Amino acid sequence: MNLRGLFQDFNPSKFLIYACLLLFSVLLALRLDGIIQWSYWAVFAPIWLWKLMVIVGASVGTGVWARNPQYRAEGETCVEFKAMLIAVGIHLLLLMFEVLVCDRIERGSHFWLLVFMPLFFVSPVSVAACVWGFRHDRSLELEILCSVNILQFIFIALRLDKIIHWPWLVVCVPLWILMSFLCLVVLYYIVWSVLFLRSMDVIAEQRRTHITMALSWMTIVVPLLTFEILLVHKLDGHNAFSCIPIFVPLWLSLITLMATTFGQKGGNHWWFGIRKDFCQFLLEIFPFLREYGNISYDLHHEDSEETEETPVPEPPKIAPMFRKKARVVITQSPGKYVLPPPKLNIEMPD
């Protein structure tokens, strides 16, 4: 494994999001099971940390942009800065939704439709952001997730306010449609991995990449679908599981997503105004890391080089010895005997 290349492709933004979601889901499961008695404002602490990092990073990036006009003429700089502003706007709407959720749980004084109102605004904004991202070749996973779930948000709000009395299995129909699409993606990667394994014209690196993608998608989608099914059955009263066993598949998916961030290129360079890859930024701040991080080992290659460089000792040379009777020649390699060729009699013509 090439650790240097692995960290060069590290995406710190996604890692922060998945880590905060993992910690939040652990605290939420413990709170729902009554193991901890914290306030929900404390349970949402990882979410507040996530949004705080977004706001601070965008503020610093905007300050660097304003103080350095020369940066605006650099290639994709304007596109990346606009993408950061779009992401900040969506995160602020999500922050408003999360604050309303905590207030509704703690005090219970207003309708869930009002709580979900920021999400109803997020969806059309996310659709516009996706159109802009496709035109400028930008990857916008969060925006796509918010845009395709507008119907799911409406159903959940209506069900929580008891305006509709459908079972949760029916309420989550838009979610099942989305998960069916993800299952097709998993099947697609599995089929292509099998085809690449059976093909002799594909190099080993491509086979390894497709197998890794297939395993990653399986480890993400299958546990996530399991979590959703268990949660819906619990809400409908079909099982009496505690929340921790239900959340375990979700934790597995989030851990896998965290692992995949080490092989994903991308990330906006304008967060905190660093304007470069995160690992390169760290190496410039902490130069001593270069001594330990910029080293690669190849034991097999080193062994082969040592074998090539080490001269092979030659066997001692022994003078040839001839014996007339046996007509045996002892060559320079002791112990190896070669019979001489038979005599040829060439008769000269008269």
Curated annotation (Swiss-Prot):
One Pfam match, by short name? Tmemb_185A
User: What family does this belong to?
Assistant: Belongs to the TMEM185 family.
Where is it made, tissue-wise?
Broadly expressed in brain where it is specifically expressed by neurons (at protein level). Also detected in some cells of arterioles, intestine, lung and testis (at protein level).
**Compartments where found:** Cell projection, Dendrite; Membrane
Q: How does it assemble?
A: Interacts with MAP1B.
**Induction comment from the UniProt entry of this chain:** Up-regulated by erythropoietin (at protein level).
Q: Which GO terms describe its cellular component?
A: dendrite; membrane
Region named Mediates interaction with MAP1B: 298-350
The protein here is known as Transmembrane protein 185A
Instruction: Read off the InterPro entries from this record.
Output: TM_Fragile-X-F-assoc
Please give, as recorded in its UniProt entry, the membrane topology of this protein.
Multi-pass membrane protein
Keywords linked to the UniProt accession? Cell projection, Membrane, Transmembrane, Transmembrane helix
Q: Where are its TM segments located?
A: 16-36, 41-61, 81-101, 111-131, 177-197, 211-231, 240-260
